[in-house]
Amino acid sequence: MKKILISVMLFAACVFAVSAQEKEKEVKKGWSFGVLPTATFSVDNGFQAGAFGDVYNYGDGNTYPDPLHKFSWEVSYFTKSQRMRFYLAYDSKYLIPNMRVNVSATYVRDPLYSFWGFNGGASLAGLANPYDLWTNKDVNSNYFGINYYGMSRNMLRILANVQGRIVPHLNWAAGINFWNWQVGDMKDTGFKVKGDNDKHYYDKTSTLYRDYVALGIISADEAAGGNALELNAGLVFDTRDIEAAPNRGIWAEAYLNGNVLAHQYLKACVYFRHYVDIPIHIKAGDPVFAYRLAWQQTIAGQTPLYMIQNVPLLVQRNMISEGFGSSNTIRGLRENRILTEGFAWLNTELRVKIVNFKLFNQFFYIAVNPFFDAGIITKAARAQAFERAKTANAATFLPLSSIYDASKVGDIVYSAGAGLKIAMNQNFIISAEFAKCFYKPLDAGLWIGIGINYQF
């Protein structure tokens, strides 16, 4: 998959280099459509089939490269995890004068969702190779395969966020997000084992999810899911010249985010992003050094199982905003590998445009972005529950000593890699990134992430 993607992108660069004299800064008017098949692959979920895209309305071009209105959508299915995703979103800074409106609806069905436990490297620390127990189809003595990290979840999310101007570049922000979660054992449809025509299944009783419930780390009133109604409010400081891929400016947010239904909690969220233009005058555009400093922590209450993976955002850049690990935070880690109550992280990358060109009356550029990511847990999840579990008299598939080591909670996680981007009209950006985690307990080999947009 990696070789095919790189070949296609290099071919595009060669074919259209003759048009590299075209300037991206030309004005785009009217409607613009970006539609692509979701022919991607990830280690966590397998191949993705479906389609996604953005629809932009630039009006008379006075706001270009920012659109007057933006619609985003996706319909897709993943072959390995059998995940289904449906997504529709709208974003505009011009629908209501001096206000930004962002609304979306999302449905995700995850029959084979991977739950890696709480607190990152502390989870599964006693296992020589935790990934031996991940979707292992070799039949054991009970005629079952082992997917120790398997569980299921269905999610419905409806959100609406607004921002209004206080003074130039400083906005107030507020929003409301509704979630409905149904979680439980894997919903396994069966699989074939080489040399055997019978259909086999994963053992639903031998999972980390079941062990956490038995040990009391996951309580009975959250084990099957529930509803959440999150309210958020805060401030946004924004001096970016372009939203999708800034050349210069600062984008900072500070806000509180809390659930007012069952399992109430309150989180503090701080994000600081800085984009620095490097005056090396490449024909396609100056390189940009970009970095993000971020911190999210529960300051009151306890986040339930079904919400702990969420990374609250005032404006959605991607369909799913979750997971310390994977494309949203620390690249090179498995999806949602770090589930905790507090986390601080750093992302740095150098964005270099290689070539720009015009095709079918659309403006394109190709860029690369080498990057380095790092993060650390600032507040562990369920620390008291893990202490109580040491004396729990419960039948589990693996003992607590094999699946948790509290001494690793404070370890620094870091990774590095590089990405390739193709952008249309400076807004519709196809992204392919490759990374490696250098913190051994969370190293799972080469990570591949293919999707849309820069990470931040």
PLM feature spans:
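Short loop/turn motifs that connect adjacent beta-strands in outer-membrane beta-barrel proteins
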Residues: 21-32, 59-68, 95-101, 165-172, ...
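Gram-negative/organellar outer-membrane beta-barrel architecture
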Residues: 23-33, 41-221, 328, 442-455
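Residues that define the transmembrane beta-barrel architecture of outer-membrane proteins
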Residues: 31-33, 45-49, 82-86, 152-158, ...
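Transmembrane beta-strands of outer-membrane beta-barrel proteins
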Residues: 33-35, 69-73, 99-104, 170-174, ...
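Transmembrane beta-strands of outer-membrane beta-barrel pores
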Residues: 41-43, 55-57, 75-81, 105-111, ...
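Surface-exposed extracellular loop regions of Gram-negative outer-membrane beta-barrel proteins
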Residues: 51-73, 230-274, 417-434
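C-terminal outer-membrane beta-barrel translocator/porin domains of Gram-negative envelope proteins
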Residues: 234, 242-360, 380, 402
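Predominantly the C-terminal beta-signal and adjacent terminal strand-loop region
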Residues: 293-295, 421-456
